Amino acid sequence: MKPGASSRRTIREAGATPQAPIQFEFDAGAGRHRVWGTAFVSQEGLAVNLVGGDVPHIGAVAISIPRPSRADARRRSATTSVFALPGHKEDELARPFAASLAQALGRTTVVVAGVHIRRAGPADIAKVFENAGRAVEAIIARLKAPPRDRDWRVAVDGFAVSVVRTPSRRGRKRS
């Protein structure tokens, strides 16, 4: 190697081909308590947009980075930071959602959350959290599935994830 040259090789130089990004949609629940969104998976991590209720919006953003647990290095934990817009409480949804995904998948995870239900009571909030939990389970199941099974729908307790693959650049005609 020449002096000053980097010893790091790109994926293509190492002879590997990068995994194509995957994008899919999810939803859980019904009516006012329904949550839905999209997940975008790349080699660098996972980005999830989670919205729902009467007024879908951006209320909070969480980023979670997986790391070894301080209590038991054989287990995975996550460090999570959250930014909530003034007057919004979606940080309570975005933080555990991002942390659960990062811990289970070992990927840096960003979650943008915005769920608003007009005149919501404690039961409404509990139902939204339950549906978000189902969404987490389905996303984890989808991404832990063997590659050959990823083109199939994944059902978790009657909850389905629809898969939409990001188009490959190969085979496209240039205009």
Please give the residue ranges for each predicted region:
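Short, Lys/Arg-rich amphipathic alpha-helical interaction segments
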Residues: 141-157
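Short Lys/Arg-rich cationic patches that frequently serve as NLS/NoLS or arginine-rich RNA/DNA-binding motifs
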Residues: 2-8, 165-175
